[in-house]
């Protein structure tokens, strides 16, 4: 298993947890938009709550597609733009302040649309507002997509 992250603090936390669990894990310093990894070298990529803060989500998804083997799978769990128009309008209104206050996190990214545009076919998809979470921040999508050749 290989993990990539631009933040050394995140590496240390993940390495400690992986060691506790006995999981062999290789850490690579880098960004999702320009991974220092060979093309077509992974069967599966797991991405969780990342696209909200990655500066160029499109480039990150293109890089994920590049490092996946033909017909490789992307498994994702993300939050993003709500399907309800009124909620999406509020997300757009408060996103600039939200992004500044919360480390670059964006509320209103159209995750599923981006995945499709990056050359993936959605295989499974679930979505919902998380219970107990304000609707402007609680719309989540999760599923899997296959790299299209």
State each model region's role.
Residues 43-56:
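A short SAM/SAH-binding and catalytic strip from SAM-dependent methyltransferases
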Residues 71-79:
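Conserved beta-strand signature within the Rossmann-like core of class I S-adenosyl-L-methionine
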Residues 58-70:
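A short glycine-rich, Lys/Arg-flanked "PGG" loop and its adjoining helix->strand segment in the class I
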Residues 120-123, 127-149:
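Core SAM-dependent methyltransferase catalytic element
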Residues 103-119:
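Short alpha-helix
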